[in-house]
């Protein structure tokens, strides 16, 4: 579950932050506002036609009224229809633009967050933020804006008309205004609280569904259908409960406002029955005033609901701004190098993972000469992958320093640093695209078709690619679901081969390959590693026997170091791991 800054800003402060996103589309807002006012005015004017119809048309039998009134009605209906279309189109255009801008800003910001951020958050929750919450901001806010302008204009127009015909009766409306405003203020806070809980529940709902879909094979093989069903039932019920709380609050709120308005209507009827007042009223006047008060019920009801609608949008907006306020990866380096030599030094490096009290790495010291290969071996959780995470600056060290070609790692621009590194890990991620575009990921316009095919051939991937109907242009599905694990790993190796970086990182790069394919690929990797600095993490110790140096990591410490033969003769941890592996 997401945990963000809890310094909740007010609705006004949140809206002030949202306004710069809306402002570039102000022309659409202005046009929408004008047409909404026209729409509301046409409704009020059609109601005003009742007075001349009753007093002059029927009361005085004036036939001229029946000549111009149909034309007026057609004209007003035409204005009403055009203004309704224009306002809906403009509001939809503005809200669509705002949703797009919010999603783009959020997507870009999340993409530049440090790795530690993604460790704490579920994918489903983040997807919910990008899709559901950003849509809530625009749809709720635009809906509230439409209601405020159109219904507000209706109320103002009707009130002006009522005061024009009889200010005495219309003064009764003044009595209900404070009651309505106090009620809205009291309920607004509850609407906002429920909205935030609904967003949290939606994130949990998305996360639960996403976990089941991603791990459906594990669910089937371990018979976890009942567990996943119970989990999803729980979060979906939580979502339902929050929705019902919103409905409950709104259902109580609406009748309360309508009761207040009904009392005002009753007072008008009573006041109209007073003889001194009746003398000043005609049938048309009292009909217009009474009809106006009845018609006022609808915009009053809509305005009571606008608080819930607006608070829902502002609550979602505040959640998104909470993410946007989080600090992205630190990138204060100034060095922008085309190609480094690849001389790496870890100097007394100590590192703690966030929220952990014990160091994952403690006083690590080693160096890799340019063009040399260093292997990291050890049991799972010993700290091997952490060293890789620090070299790529997925995390920043707490103590010590890491040097690359004599410069501190922090002195390099992040993009420049990572352009020097090609990495193949055991957890391969492929995109829902063609094989060629996956191999040339992020640089598809930089490499030729021939170079992509050469990389695929060196990675022993052309064996299965050539058997596919579309070859390199085959779409492989989300995360390469149409490929086997071994095929996916070969694509990842081809991607690393194509990048031609001076630093190579292999984190169990051939773990999903059969022995024959692994033997062939290692020949290609040996060619690739020439004149390049290589860092290899391996559990299969046979793959690191030719490394220039082997570091044995245990509980965050370097326990042993040396070449394969020397470490075997020492009969230490490495020798034990080696014997254990080959005896099995």
Curated annotation (Swiss-Prot):
SUPFAM superfamilies: ABC transporter transmembrane region, P-loop containing nucleoside triphosphate hydrolases
Transmembrane segments: 18-38, 65-85, 155-175, 252-272, 277-297
Domain ABC transmembrane type-1 span(s) in chain numbering: 30-312
Pfam families: ABC_membrane (PF00664), ABC_tran (PF00005)
The protein's name: ATP-dependent lipid A-core flippase
Principal location listed in the UniProt entry: membrane
Membrane topology annotation: Multi-pass membrane protein
EC number: 7.5.2.6
Binding site for ATP: 378-385
């Amino acid at each position: 579950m997401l945990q963000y800054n809890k310094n909740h800003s007010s609705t006004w402060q949140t809206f002030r932050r949202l306004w710069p996103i809306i402002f570039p589309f102000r022309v659409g807002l202005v046009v929408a506002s004008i047409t909404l006012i026209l729409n509301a005015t046409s409704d009020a004017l059609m109601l005003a036609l009742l007075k001349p119809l009753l007093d002059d048309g029927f009361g005085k039998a004036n036939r001229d009224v029946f000549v111009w009134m149909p034309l007026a009605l057609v004209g007003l209906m035409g204005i009403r229809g055009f203004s309704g279309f224009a306002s809906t189109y403009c509001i939809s255009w503005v809200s669509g633009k705002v949703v797009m801008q919010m999603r783009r800003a959020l997507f870009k910001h999340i993409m530049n967050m440090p790795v530690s951020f993604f460790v704490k958050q579920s994918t489903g929750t983040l997807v919910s933020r990008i899709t559901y919450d950003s849509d809530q901001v625009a749809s709720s806010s635009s809906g509230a804006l439409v209601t405020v302008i159109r219904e507000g204009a209706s109320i103002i127009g009707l009130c002006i008309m009522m005061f024009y015909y009889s200010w005495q009766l219309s003064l009764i409306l003044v009595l209900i205004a404070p009651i309505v405003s106090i009620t809205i203020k009291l309920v607004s806070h509850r609407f906002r609280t429920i909205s935030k809980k609904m967003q949290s529940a939606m994130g949990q709902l998305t996360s639960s569904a996403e976990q089941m879909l991603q791990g459906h094979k594990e669910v089937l093989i371990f018979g976890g259908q009942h567990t996943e069903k119970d989990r999803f039932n729980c979060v979906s019920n939580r979502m339902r409960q929050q929705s019902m709380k919103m409905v409950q609050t709104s259902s109580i709120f609406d009748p309360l406002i309508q009761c207040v308005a009904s009392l005002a209507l009753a007072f008008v009827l009573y006041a109209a029955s007073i003889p001194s007042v009746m003398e000043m009223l005609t049938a048309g006047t009292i009909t217009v005033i009474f009809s106006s008060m009845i018609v006022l019920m609808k915009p009053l009801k809509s305005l009571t609901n606008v608080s819930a609608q607006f608070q829902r949008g502002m609550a979602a907006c505040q959640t998104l701004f909470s993410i946007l306020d989080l600090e992205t990866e630190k990138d204060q380096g100034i060095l922008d190098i085309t190609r480094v030599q690849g001389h790496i030094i870890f100097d007394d490096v100590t590192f703690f993972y966030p929220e952990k009290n014990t160091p994952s790495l403690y006083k690590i010291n080693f160096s890799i000469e340019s063009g040399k290969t260093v292997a990291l071996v050890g049991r799972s959780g010993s700290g091997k992958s952490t060293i890789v995470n620090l070299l790529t600056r997925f995390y920043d060290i707490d103590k010590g320093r890491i040097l690359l070609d004599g410069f501190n790692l922090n002195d390099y621009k992040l993009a420049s640093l990572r352009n020097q590194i090609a990495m193949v890990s055991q957890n391969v991620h492929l995109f829902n695209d063609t094989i060629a575009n996956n191999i040339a990921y992020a640089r598809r316009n930089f490499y030729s078709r021939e170079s992509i095919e050469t990389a695929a051939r060196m990675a022993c991937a052309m064996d299965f690619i050539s058997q596919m109907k579309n070859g390199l242009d085959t779409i492989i599905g989300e995360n390469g679901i149409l490929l086997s694990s071994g095929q996916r790993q070969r694509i990842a190796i081809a991607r690393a081969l194509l990048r031609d970086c001076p630093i190579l990182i292999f984190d169990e790069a051939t773990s999903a390959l059969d022995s024959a394919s692994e033997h062939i690929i290692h020949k290609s990797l040996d060619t690739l590693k020439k004149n390049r600095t290589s860092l290899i993490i391996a559990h299969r110790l046979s793959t690191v026997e030719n490394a220039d140096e082997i570091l044995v990591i245990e509980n965050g410490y370097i326990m042993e170091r040396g070449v394969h033969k020397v470490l075997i003769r020492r009969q230490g941890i490495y020798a034990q791991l080696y014997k254990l592996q080959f005896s099995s």
